[in-house]
Amino acid sequence: VGNQILNSLRWTTGSGVAVNEINPSSFQPIPPFLGEKIPAVSPVEFRNSGFTEAHLRNTYYEGYFLSSNITHHIAQCLDQDSRLVYAYYDGIDKVGHIHGTGHFYDAEIALVDYLIGQIYKILPSGTALIVTSDHGMVDVGDSVIEINDSLMQRINTISGEARFLWFHPARGNHESLLRDLQDLYGNCAWVRTKDQILDEGWFGRQISDQAKERLGEIALLARDPVAFLDKENPGPKLVGRHGSLTETEVYVPLITSFKE
């Protein structure tokens, strides 16, 4: 955004919290839930964050402290005749990042299965329950590739995340950077220019000029179970990661049930 990299989850830049400098409502201008004001049951620590303002603004925010509270918050919303209730739980994502998709992950999925069952029990007749996810998870572990030093010397900055990096080349380095990225990483990743991605409609048919300006010039997307990191700023060490366009990451469940 401008000449700074925004961490949208924390709503921070290199200068710190950026809520005042980067207005969440301007950054993400589409009204959530088609402008309808509904209850949003989500972790209490996310209340009033920049990211929450961007995607859940104008909701009745019902912050929960523990997963055991979620069902009761939803029940309270339904008792108030809410036509639609949104609820978010981040346990599977956290466990996947920390432990990968092994026994810990399976245990968390079992917990979520129980939670969904409890939610279904308190639904009034004539209510639909829809369960989905925002992404999958890939076990990367120690399969980390540090970006080549010669590449880093030809860029202004990197944005994105470890499985979907955007390179912002310094002036005059676009062609050589594109060629070398393809040569070095084409065996385990997709390399695409911004123009290719926009022409192929990766982000939909209509992209605002403001959104286009946030993109880098060249994208590097992991195809294999690897992560690409800047060794000067590697970020947290994670076992499970997501962000690329493999089937494991983009195909998510959609489970629906109607309470008669």
Regions found by a protein language model. Give the residues of each.
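Feature captures the catalytic ectodomains and active-site-proximal regions of enzymes
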Residues: 1-260
